[in-house]
Amino acid sequence: MRGLCEFYWQEFGIKGFSVAQKPFGATYVWSSIINTLQTQVEVKKRRHRLKRHNDCFVGSEAVDVIFSHLIQNKYFGDVDIPRAKVVRVCQALMDYKVFEAIPTKVFGKDKKPTFEDSSCSLYRFTTIPNQDSQLGKENKLCSPSRYADALFKSSDIKSASLEDLWENLSLKPANSPHVNISATLSPQVINEVWQEETIGRLLQLVDLPLLDSLLKQQEAVPKVPQSKRQSDMVNSSNYLDRGILKAYSDSQEDEWLSAAIDCLEYLPDQMVVEISRSFPEQPDRTDLVKELLFDAIGRYYSSREPLLNHLSDVHNGIAELLVNGKTEIALEATQLLLKLLDFQNREEFRRLLYFMAVAANPSEFKLQKESDNRMVVKRIFSKAIVDNKNLSKGKTDLLVLFLMDHQKDVFKIPGTLHKIVSVKLMAIQNGRDPNRDAGYIYCQRIDQRDYSNNTQKTTKDELLNLLKTIDEDSKLSAKEKKKLLGQFYKCHPDIFIEHFGD
């Protein structure tokens, strides 16, 4: 922990603390980061590398949580913090055993534990033994204070690597740093702010002819996400069939099968029973199993309501951005659109999109003999994602393929939204008007003198550019150029003389 503290003092800065207070301040900050991660990131049973692991969280969600926490508490003042630097903070926490990556091997060798900002990378919090207890007693999950205490007392931890990391982060300390110890806001208020600002940011990126759909979305009461998803299958008489399918998937080192079995959780019991009872007698015929699973998943999603059936006007806006080659803006707009999904639909869509991306891989199981896997997946699942009558088939296909190609990124939360939400939450928390420092500024009020000066300067600059364009246009004949220059001199002689001289 000593390395973490020095790291924090040097680059993130807590100059408001005296020398005697520095250990307390640094301990508080790091404990706060760890506590926020432990309490806000979603921990549940997940699949990773064809195996199922308990109590895991997603790398991209960890970045989202810490990113929001750092900005909201203004540990670094108003400086912009890139998402990449938050990823490196997560790497530092992983290096110090706050959490660990799910063990993976690449070609039989242990993979270097590098933190990944991805919805496909999973991590779990570490445990440390109670030093006062005897051998054999159960380990407990570290509380933030236990982490700080254990890391401070550890003589094995070297601070050099962390100090180098903090130096490379290049974050200057705030002039008036402030450790926020005020009461936290309720989850309901936080979710309402997230929804309001998400919609506001979406309006900035996408041109909408009508605001009805967004206003209806804003009127809906946001649901507070549950920490763990309660399964309704436990008491089902068909739970055994689901268990058999999961056991089969776990026994096969096949990413395709793993992604497909994950999707079965959302299929009705009757379909799952049919799949289980229709399994081929030869267990090694994975081609028949994949054909069975793909057909069942395709049939189910072709007969249910599309997962992105909300905000149809936004679909058109995103598709238009893609047509115009504005991929980065389209990606952020898509991230905002998916942020408006409730947790259950968001998780279901994430699993389906992951399965689609895996199944569309040309090196995977051939879905149809004379068709490309990518086109088959698009055709089967397009209506399961978007069924918008106002969206042409070409734009629908473009949108679906874009989602498949960027399935690892579309569920991340944009950094711009993080900052805007954090500023507003901080204002609410401190009792200020949350709309005073709004994140979306469409115009700025200026006095008449500044307006007049700006108008004259802008007009003059544009006229000079026009004159320069006429003078340097090689496509104009000498006669045409002389005529245009004469007209310009007649209307704006002062600018003409300024450019050409007397």
UniProtKB/Swiss-Prot annotation:
Gene3D superfamilies: Winged helix-like DNA-binding domain superfamily/Winged helix DNA-binding domain. It comes from Macaca fascicularis (Crab-eating macaque). PROSITE patterns: DEP. GO terms for biological process: intracellular signal transduction. Belongs to the DEPDC7 family. It comes from the Eukaryota. This is DEP domain-containing protein 7. Pfam families: DEP (PF00610). Residues 37-127 form the DEP domain. PANTHER family: DEP DOMAIN-CONTAINING, DEP DOMAIN-CONTAINING PROTEIN 7.
